Each structure stands twice: as C-alpha cells, then as structure tokens.
Amino acid sequence: MDDRFVKEINQFFAEIKIQNNVRLVDGKFGKMCVIKHEPTGKLFVKKSVAIKYVTEIEPLVHQLMKDNRYFIKLYYSLTTLKSQILILDYVAGGDLFDFLKKHKKVSEAETRSIVGQLTEALNALHSYKIIHNDLKLENVLYVRHKQIYLCDYGLCKIVNTSSCRDGTKEYMSPEKLKRQNYDVHVDWWALGILTYELLIGHHPYKHSNDNEEDFDLDVLQQRQQKKLHKYNFLSSDAQKFLEAMLMYNINYRLCTYETVIKHSFLS
C-alpha cells in the first residue's frame, strides 16, 4: 500500500458519516452500512468481511466488471488484521426480494426486461470463466423501469473447479446437488428459479408450509424431477421459457447464453 493511497483512504474515512436512516441487510459473510461522503454528499456502501471469510475473487470480479453497467462499482478495497473493507456504489431502490414482496408478482413485460438484463450480466461474467454461484432475488438490485445490478460476488467461482453445496439451497441446480464441477449451468438454473418467482410469486419447489428442517436437499432433488405446474394466466412463451430453464435433464435445458437469449420469451 503506497503512501499516496494511504493518505487518500485516510482522508476519505475522515470525511464520511454512517447513515443510520438507511438500513441494509447484512450478507452471510459481510456486514454492510450506508455511508455519506460529507464534502460531495455522495452515498456509498461500506462492506466489512471478517478475515476468515475473505476471498480474492470478490475484488477481482469488481475489477474485471468495472466498466459493465450491470455490476456494482468498487471504489476502495483494503484489508486489516480483522477484516476486508470494500467501499461500493450505493444503489437506491432495493433488491428484487423486497420488490416482489411488495408487488406479489411481476408482469411478463417487466420480468422480460429484468431477466434480459440479467442474461447479459451473467454472459459478461461467464466470458471470464467465472460464475456468480449465488444468483437469487436478494442479490439483484433493481431501479424500477431503468436497470438491474448484479451484486455480492463473494461466492463467485472459477468454471470447472471442484464444487461444494455452497450458496443458497433453494437455487441449487441438479448438477450442483450432485457436486459436479462448477459450470455456467449453475447460474442459468438459478435464473430460471428467479424468473419463476417473479412471474408466479413464489418458489417452484419450496412450499409455503415447508420449514427449514423439512426442506432438505433430498426433498429439493425429488421435487426438481417433477413437471412444473402450468399456469393459465401465463403466455405460451413464458410457460415454455420456465419449462425449458428448469428442465431436470440438462440435455434438454436452456443452459447457455445463446439458447437463453434467443428464446421467444426474451426476443
């Protein structure tokens, strides 16, 4: 860490103030708060990750995707004896989880826009042989009628490395449950789950009366093998898209950028 950077970061931290009126939900491994840079009035997110959970991949993804509009901009990254601190762009508007909770379900037109943008974001990340590995409603920030931001890169993984059942179990693909090597299909399956949640208003495999003890990975795997329920209020294109994204047999599933983006629901 050179002297100029130390001086700059010390000055920045001397000029910020925590905004207690803006609440953020902490992630699995990091605590987050909104801070205001007093001289400019700009809001940032300060993310602190305990040193035992720190990985090199999160700052790397920020660096690789720094010019991509669908990813969060990183301003500063520094590591102390106890934690890694990231200073990130603050995006007003909240995440898709809160948005869906408020609106119950989302129109096909708005879902198409959201999913189309996520498809482009994932393809950009995959071009570096990196998967997000934890795509879910909570990890997509949404400025309504404008754009999405894919966030939280702490569980990103390199394609074709050995996998484990990390991430959020409700979004795990059949292949991930079988502990096959990490591949892009992990993210495309999760996108199918997310699309279903937006259009239908609930998860395709987790029932409202499930508790965490009953809904284990074996139950999830059994339910994934059953055909999806058909909904008459969906268009034929939307129904076919969900079925193709969540086909249990990967040989018949949409699990590449080219097949996803060309589907009639998105085109």
From Swiss-Prot:
The keyword Nucleotide-binding applies. Keywords: ATP-binding, Kinase, Nucleotide-binding, Serine/threonine-protein kinase, Transferase. InterPro entries: Kinase-like_dom_sf, Prot_kinase_dom, Ser/Thr_kinase_AS. One of its GO terms (molecular function) is protein serine kinase activity. Residues 18-266 form the Protein kinase domain. Its EC number is 2.7.11.1. It is an enzyme of class 2 (transferase). It catalyses: L-seryl-[protein] + ATP = O-phospho-L-seryl-[protein] + ADP + H(+); L-threonyl-[protein] + ATP = O-phospho-L-threonyl-[protein] + ADP + H(+). The active site is at residue 134. Disulfide bonds: none annotated. The keyword Nucleus does not apply. ATP binds at residues 24-32, 47. Belongs to the protein kinase superfamily. Ser/Thr protein kinase family. This is Serine/threonine-protein kinase 1. It comes from Heliothis zea nuclear polyhedrosis virus (HzSNPV).
